[in-house]
Amino acid sequence: MRMPAGFLINAMKKQNLVILGSTGSIGKSTLSVIEHNPEKYHAFALVGGRNVDLMVEQCVKFQPEFAALDDENAAKQLAEKLKSAGKKTKVLAGQKAICELAAHPEADQVMAAIVGAAGLLPTLSAVQASKTVLLANKETLVTCGQIFIDEVKRTKARLLPVDSEHNAIFQSLPPEAQQQIGFCPLKELGINKIVLTGSGGPFRYTDLTEFDNITPEQAVAHPNWSMGKKISVDSATMMNKGLEYIEARWLFNAGAEEMEVIIHPQSIIHSMVRYIDGSVIAQMGNPDMRTPIAETMAYPGRIVSGVTPLDFYQLSGLTFLEPDYERYPCLKLAIEAFAAGQYATTAMNAANEIAVEAFLNRMIKFTDIARVNAKVVELIQPQQINCIDDVLAVDKQSRLVAKEVIVSLKA
């Protein structure tokens, strides 16, 4: 049973948040939610990559105890600028320091929002420290799902999904399932299928003959969501939905027959759960990431997110389409990669990061992204993934192979 709005949060001390990826889209939305609830939450530590100016701005506004940047030179610049501004925030640098912040004894919640494989080790550090982890980093489950879920179970860390689709599924599940993320018995709880929705991106009606000519500017212009460049391209190829499919399989302990992917262009229904009695429970709302962020921060209570309420009278209609794998080969590849094993999903994810970067830099065509991903998965030797070092080894090898494939495409 869910607590009344604000009940649990009001009864507790102010929650300290470590925001991994504070300068990114999810990080900025998290800070917006904190701004709406200053009496309940404190930005204890902010972590970024190399965006010094934005980190300075965030530190001045939210006054965290710690700030960390992955890039050491950027961290030095940050320290100098904060000192000049008279701020006492302690500045740290590098992956080791970031992992230590994720596991800091004074941290109550960790928002895991670093994009890509770079977020893997800090997120794992938070789990190993038994933190409440608000999971927005898809790659953690895509690259080492079994290892990660096993660690969650072993450490009794609380895992709450932030991705709008997975959060919608989470909210549509019975309380017993919410308490068993990663190992809930769906059938025993009367659940028939997890229904994952996706907008289909900006090119769902574009003629396939035009796909070779799609530009980075067109690909990052998502029709519904405000997101970073990489995830916007992933949405356009539906690799984003493929990664979410893999993530959902791990989060909800779902078999292939318990998964359904459908295209819902309006992005109003964020995902659904089918029950064995014919009921379908869906979570709806305006497409704004502050809603799922606020839900995870307050769980099992509710807090103000700053999101405009859904106006049903403004809806022109809700439509649904079956995914077209010719239009979205990356989605098909992701489903097949999960069936092949953890090595394949790791290889695919690494290849995709390299391919998307190459596309954004105009080195390859939009349609080459899927070609690079498929070729890398084909070339990487099938192997057993037993530990994090195995994951990192496959990730590193796959990135090198992806770069070679890109060179061959340009030849």
Curated annotation (Swiss-Prot):
Known EC number: 1.1.1.267
Biological process according to GO: isopentenyl diphosphate biosynthetic process, methylerythritol 4-phosphate pathway involved in terpenoid biosynthetic process
Domain of life per record: Bacteria
UniProt KW keywords: Isoprene biosynthesis, Manganese, Metal-binding, NADP, Oxidoreductase
Record InterPro entries: DXP_reductoisomerase (IPR003821), DXP_reductoisomerase_C (IPR013644), DXP_reductoisomerase_N (IPR013512), DXPR_C (IPR026877), DXPR_C_sf (IPR036169), NAD(P)-bd_dom_sf (IPR036291)
Pathway assignment: Isoprenoid biosynthesis; isopentenyl diphosphate biosynthesis via DXP pathway; isopentenyl diphosphate from 1-deoxy-D-xylulose 5-phosphate: step 1/6
Cofactors, names only: Mg(2+); Mn(2+)
Cross-referenced NCBIfam families: Dxr, PRK05447.1-1, PRK12464.1
Name of the protein this chain belongs to: 1-deoxy-D-xylulose 5-phosphate reductoisomerase
Species of origin: Mannheimia succiniciproducens (strain KCTC 0769BP / MBEL55E)
Gene: dxr
